[in-house]
Design a protein with these regions (language model features):
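Surface-exposed amphipathic alpha-helical segments in non-transmembrane regions
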Residues: 414-415, 421-423, 460-461, 522, ...
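Intrinsic disorder/low-complexity segments
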Residues: 466-491
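Short, low-order "capping/linker" segments at domain edges
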Residues: 491, 505-518, 551-557
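Helicase-associated low-complexity/disordered flanking segments
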Residues: 1-4
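Short amphipathic alpha-helices in soluble, non-transmembrane regions
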Residues: 452-458, 527-535
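Short beta-strand elements
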Residues: 308-309, 464-469, 492-502, 543-552
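AMP-binding (ANL) adenylation modules
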Residues: 428-430, 503-506
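Inter-lobe coupling/hinge segments of SF2-like helicase ATPases
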Residues: 6-11, 16-97, 102-450, 513-515, ...
Length: 557
């Protein structure tokens, strides 16, 4: 019961020592808990730091704290350099008791820190992908520890790393979820409706019926699809070739309304080609479904409905987001179609019907966290629906009905997902059960990049052998010894995987190869990486070579 939280956090703050909590609950519940914790810290003469992954959420958190009687500072990348400097100075001058911001705020010069709150702790945006790389959640943990403050990680669906910390006794979990607030969830097997579903639309008869029922009730319907554009790609009907980005060697996303194709990685756009560059055929056809294509199908099926689309094409500026929010709040939309951007709005109007046309999108990518991301996205979609007792329904379309993420969402039971996913991670020896370092070698000449990556891998394997880690079979990818105690094992075995071309082997005109270093001891893994990197730094760098190190990478693809 969340009503117990004020007493819980009050007792923890009385200790004047580092402590950590993991809160799982709906957005409104987490916000209430944040306000209670902030007030308790301020009453004890301590200051509060709140960190979240995106600018919009930071603004909402600051507004909520202000409405509760506090006047927080707000720090994020949307401010000008002068505005950020002013906020930084105010934080240093102790003129405000609360600072709210995106990941950069975790470094703000706040003294007397009593509470560090990380909202949406599973959000990948908390990881800075540019050098110097850091994860704001882990920096927050270190700050709280150094300042003898209380750390609270909060989310609707905590990361596997945080759940593992709870299981190891490193954090205390507070689960504040009301089962009565869940909608009715139905799973649709797309394989059973392949003939009845219009090609490329992913809109099966049951999904259409769900939308129709919401319209009959004059209620809101939402369709969530984490793929923008009219279709994923264009492909040649004769030879199968797809238009690709010249700089990144990845397929270009097709946008019908603006009649252009765009690279998802470098952002380059160009007009839709009128023929195949490989065989000169004129049969270029869209393949796959994006939000734009779903919107077209919905408008065709429900011509009188007021339809809105939320993705990177329609919401480009804060003003666009505000305009959409006003339309929604005024009840001027019947059907909303969107990507994950839907979850950034903090929608107040919950829908009578939420449909997920393609739950499997994003699952089949070379990233061991793909199932976890899919599960989190589905749970976010479920949160958009009204409770079952108020008529709320969610329909999830999939071709993988027995996937543990789908089964967990349908059952409303996190443990179904967590147990199976942890078993997979254990079997494949991936975080959080091991530590992972990704090494990227990039340059303008592919043969030089491949040679340098091979050299780095050879140096790493030599270090493994010289360190006496015979259990890893000279670092060739053999299994790590099993740990009986999970975290904190003393075994320092290391596995070297690769080198191999990166999932997207060329980006912005640079070729990239990767090496993965898995270890039971992160310190030992980092030690051999740093030592071998120093050797490479002393060697020549033909082809504009760059050697990058990413400890605990969040994005693998």
């Amino acid at each position: 019961d969340a009503a117990a939280w004020p007493d819980t956090v009050g007792r923890a703050l009385l200790q004047d020592a580092y402590g950590s909590f993991l809160i799982q609950g709906a957005r409104a519940t987490r916000l209430w808990c944040l306000v209670q914790a902030a007030r308790a810290a301020i009453r004890r003469g301590r200051r509060v730091l709140v960190v979240t992954g995106d600018v919009e959420n930071a603004g909402r958190l600051a507004e909520a704290l202000a409405a509760a009687g506090d006047r927080p500072l707000l720090l994020h990348s949307g401010l000008s350099a002068r505005e950020r400097a002013a906020v930084w100075q105010s934080a240093q001058d102790s003129s405000a008791t609360i600072l709210v911001g995106t990941r950069m705020a975790v470094f703000a010069p706040i003294d007397r820190l009593g509470l560090v709150w990380v909202e949406g702790e599973d959000d990948a945006s908390l990881k800075e992908e540019q050098s110097p790389r850091y994860h704001a959640r882990e920096v927050a943990r270190r700050r709280a520890c150094c300042d003898r403050a209380l750390l609270v990680l909060a989310s609707s669906h905590p990361s596997l790393e945080s759940w593992s910390a709870v299981q190891q006794g490193e954090m205390t979990a507070c689960v504040y979820r009301d089962p009565s607030g869940f909608p009715r969830v139905q799973v649709i097997d797309l394989r059973e409706y392949s003939r009845e579903t219009p090609a490329g639309t992913l809109l099966s008869p049951p999904l259409y019926e769900g939308i129709q029922e919401a319209l009959r009730q004059n209620a809101l319907a939402i369709l969530y699809l984490n793929r923008k554009g009219f279709a994923s790609v264009l492909h040649c009907g004769d030879c199968g070739a797809m238009p690709q980005c010249d700089a990144c060697s990845v397929a270009l996303t097709f946008f019908r309304r603006s009649n252009h194709v765009r690279c998802h990685y470098c952002g380059r756009t160009k007009p839709v080609p009128d023929h195949c560059t490989r065989c000169q055929s004129l049969k270029l056809e869209p393949v796959g479904s994006g939000t734009e294509r779903i919107e077209e199908a919905v408008r065709r099926k429900f011509p009188l409905a007021r339809v809105g689309r939320v993705d990177g094409e329609t919401i480009r500026r804060p003003a666009d987001a505000r305009a959409f929010s006003r339309l929604l709040a005024a009840g001027e939309l019947d059907i909303v179609i969107g990507t994950q951007m839907l979850f950034r709005f903090g929608l107040q109007a919950r829908a009578a019907f939420v449909g997920v046309p393609d739950a499997d999108a994003g699952l089949h990518v070379p990233d061991f966290r793909s199932a976890e991301r899919m599960y989190h996205g589905l749970m976010d979609a479920v949160e958009l629906a009204l409770p079952a007792h108020a008529g709320g329904a969610v329909m999830i379309q999939t071709r993988l009905t027995d996937h543990h993420a789908i089964m967990a969402v349908a059952a409303g039971d996190d443990s179904v997902f967590l147990q199976q996913e942890q078993a997979f991670r254990q079997m494949l020896q991936y975080p959080p059960l091991t530590s992972l370092v990704r090494l990227d070698v990039s340059g303008t000449l592919e043969p030089v990049v491949a040679q340098a990556a091979g050299r780095w891998a050879a140096l790493l394997r030599a270090e493994v052998v010289s360190a006496g880690n015979r259990g890893t079979n000279a670092g060739d990818g053999s299994p790590l010894p099993q740990r009986s105690t999970g975290f904190g094992g003393e075994t320092s075995s290391i596995v070297i995987l690769g080198p191999s071309p990166a999932p997207h082997a060329m980006a912005r005109g640079r070729y990239c190869w990767q090496i993965l270093v898995k270890s039971l001891s992160l310190e030992v893994g980092k030690e051999i990486v740093v030592r071998t990197r120093e050797v490479l730094d002393r060697e020549s760098r033909r082809g504009g070579l760059r050697f990058d190190i990413d400890v605990d990478p969040v994005a693998m693809a």
